[in-house]
Amino acid sequence: MVKVAVTGALGRMGSGIIKTITETDGLDVVAAIDIPNHPKKGLDIGELTGVGKIGVALSTSDELEVVLKESGAEVLVDFTAPAPCVNTAKTAAKLGVNLVIGTTGFTSEQRAEMENAISENKVAATISQNYAVGVNIFFKTLELLAQKLGDYDIELIEMHHKFKKDAPSGTALRAAEIIQNNLNRDSNLIFGRKGITGERTKEEICIHALRGGDVVGDHTAMFAADGERLELTHKASSRQSFISGVILAVKFVAEKKEGIYNTFDVLDLN
């Protein structure tokens, strides 16, 4: 039985992950952590997430180290925000707890700080902007499209619910990174357009971020040339698509001793 801790336990992803873990053979929720001074601290996380009492009280991040030690957590799943996630990762790594990181929006410095802590403490971690299986097939397909249609004009469009805090999405940025890594030409990433921009240059790869309603996550990569246009789209209709991938990542990283992995590793797409 893999003992799992979840931070951001009452967030959109965290609560769904906890529900799914309770329904998954071989996994056990042993700790649930949220923000300091949370008004529901001490209440049973199973009851808070609608699965019934499981005997695990909601804890807060200011007591993270104690909670991880006492619970015996082997894997910690984090879907929070960049700054708290870095602190959580450093604490967990120091205690020998493996990590599944789904938080997005890191600066390069935050990402480096987190990865250094993981490497220095010789734990294992998966870090991904999107754990959905379909999205990772989307990513893999982009490698081929960038290689074969590299001379086309390339645009990326993403849409999310009105509550999303970062833009563009981590998934869109990862898609752009994959495209750039597989082009046989120079490219320049830009974000939206405004004013008299002039003729589009061949080097441009533009990301457009849309926000509204309750959209879980839509991503489209467009490759356009004179006379034709190819569009590759992934649409998530519920967070369960992400959660299913997280469960795979938890099982994957639980068997690793050290190293930093991504969802291509989890899904054997490399």
Swiss-Prot record:
It comes from Methanococcus maripaludis (strain C5 / ATCC BAA-1333). Pathway: Amino-acid biosynthesis; L-lysine biosynthesis via DAP pathway; (S)-tetrahydrodipicolinate from L-aspartate: step 4/4. GO terms for cellular component: cytoplasm. Belongs to the DapB family. Its EC number is 1.17.1.8. It catalyses: (S)-2,3,4,5-tetrahydrodipicolinate + NAD(+) + H2O = (2S,4S)-4-hydroxy-2,3,4,5-tetrahydrodipicolinate + NADH + H(+); (S)-2,3,4,5-tetrahydrodipicolinate + NADP(+) + H2O = (2S,4S)-4-hydroxy-2,3,4,5-tetrahydrodipicolinate + NADPH + H(+). One of its GO terms (molecular function) is oxidoreductase activity, acting on CH or CH2 groups, NAD or NADP as acceptor. The gene is dapB. It comes from the Archaea. InterPro entries: DapB_C (IPR022663), DapB_N (IPR000846), DapB_N_CS (IPR022664), DHDPR_bac (IPR023940), NAD(P)-bd_dom_sf (IPR036291). GO terms for biological process: diaminopimelate biosynthetic process; lysine biosynthetic process via diaminopimelate. (S)-2,3,4,5-tetrahydrodipicolinate binds at residues 161, 170-171. This is 4-hydroxy-tetrahydrodipicolinate reductase. Pfam families: DapB_C, DapB_N.
